[in-house]
């Protein structure tokens, strides 16, 4: 169930394993990739850590592993939000340019109906 509203992402010292690959294109239409992995879970301004993103446009992202990712249109986790869940495969296009991101544990909420 990709994108299901029944999933909650819990911000923590992430125990999940995974990465987010960001494909970005420059003015010459050259596509390059940034792979976010490791211990870091919060990126309040991705353009500060990866200055190339100030001059390029993000085309799509690709998820690997069992983590949820939250992408925001403004720095410090503000603006529009898009949650990407494990199981969303392939190139995921966004309707905004993400500026801040969080990697999180994913937990399902189940109704007892």
Locations of regions flagged by a protein language model:
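Compact beta-sheet-dominated domain cores in extracellular/mature segments
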Residues: 1-113
